[in-house]
Amino acid sequence: MVLSQRQRDELNRAIADYLRSNGYEEAYSVFKKEAELDMNEELDKKYAGLLEKKWTSVIRLQKKVMELESKLNEAKEEFTSGGPLGQKRDPKEWIPRPPEKYALSGHRSPVTRVIFHPVFSVMVSASEDATIKVWDYETGDFERTLKGHTDSVQDISFDHSGKLLTSCSADMTIKLWDFQGFECIRTMHGHDHNVSSVAIMPNGDHLVSASRDKTIKMWEVQTGYCVKTFTGHREWVRMVRPNQDGTLIASCSNDQTVRVWVVATKECKAELREHEHVVECISWAPESSYSSISEATGSETKKSGKPGPFLLSGSRDKTIKMWDVSTGMCLMTLVGHDNWVRGVLFHSGGKFILSCADDKTLRVWDYKNKRCMKTLNAHEHFVTSLDFHKTAPYVVTGSVDQTVKVWECR
């Protein structure tokens, strides 16, 4: 590579400035003499720190080039593997495609949970920085921050109308927020340790929470009273989720089990134990997926004539399992993630499963053929959470890299 006379002169002056400002006096005077430089005050100012600036910008640009190359390769792959430019897909089969539509930063610590609002075009993220942030997923704009917790916010959940938001935290409290005025209406105390999960029941009258104190509690939304406690897990309860009609709740724990409870009687209806490590996440199958699941697993239709209910679980043993809750049988195990599975849910079309993990990926599974059909390198660090919009073609992910990413499905 040949430099022009002017470039050579600039480089020499930048080197001379570097030598002098870093105290290499002898080298400076020799270099100045050999390069025949006449340095003066005015020129000096122009070249001050120039070498360092160029040096750092080269590294920055190299990183950018590598990022763009990887995005280009992903786009090429999309194109050849019959991506959205190939045949037209049924919207029920749309899946998230790289690159992300938005990468949103604002949190100062790892993002612990991301969820879509059931009505408006906003989503909400919770973080270890003790805040909850609201974003517009269509424009990528940051809207506001909800402050009140004094430690890491572990989980968040909307009621079906989206007027109420609940959050739980390592500060051992559960908070209820009016999502129209963005005020905290109520704070609930009762757990003796980190509250790791919270969910508003489908009827909106109650909410359930799970904690490191090994219990699950049910609370009345109107009064904030604890009305039920479910005991049985032998270790930290990681997540709790009600089924569609609110008659059952599922929970998973560090004791390596998934439990299903009957809300009315508090009895444990099923204890699902096949994972070989902490079970991090669970998700109920929507009824729209029942026929696909029955077809894929050959699971018998029961005497009642209705299949299911079905449940997904993701574990630190790097696997995802699908369960038939009525029989307690594990219907399938999906293997592919290279690290702890942190989030799992059904695609709204019912034919696919989406998952995220500490291997920094977001994966789409064609469970009928038990194969991973798409892997997106989603974040720079562990992917802690994901959500799939019920009606709009978007997926959102949150990560230890402190960002929230919005992915468009097509």
Swiss-Prot record:
Name of protein: Platelet-activating factor acetylhydrolase IB subunit alpha
GO cellular component: 1-alkyl-2-acetylglycerophosphocholine esterase complex; astral microtubule; cell cortex; centrosome; kinetochore; microtubule associated complex; nuclear membrane
Organism encoding this protein: Macaca fascicularis
WD-type repeats, residues: 106-147, 148-187, 190-229, 232-271, 274-333, 336-377, 378-410
InterPro entries: Dynein_regulator_LIS1 (IPR017252), G-protein_beta_WD-40_rep (IPR020472), LIS1_N (IPR037190), LisH (IPR006594), PAC1-like_LisH-like_dom (IPR056795), WD40/YVTN_repeat-like_dom_sf (IPR015943), WD40_repeat_CS (IPR019775), WD40_repeat_dom_sf (IPR036322)
Region listing for Interaction with NDE1, in residue ranges: 1-66
Taxonomic lineage from the root: Eukaryota, Metazoa, Chordata, Craniata, Vertebrata
Keyword Cell inner membrane in record: no
Region (Interaction with dynein and dynactin) residue spans: 83-410
Main location as per UniProt: cytoplasm
Interaction with DCX: annotated span: 367-409
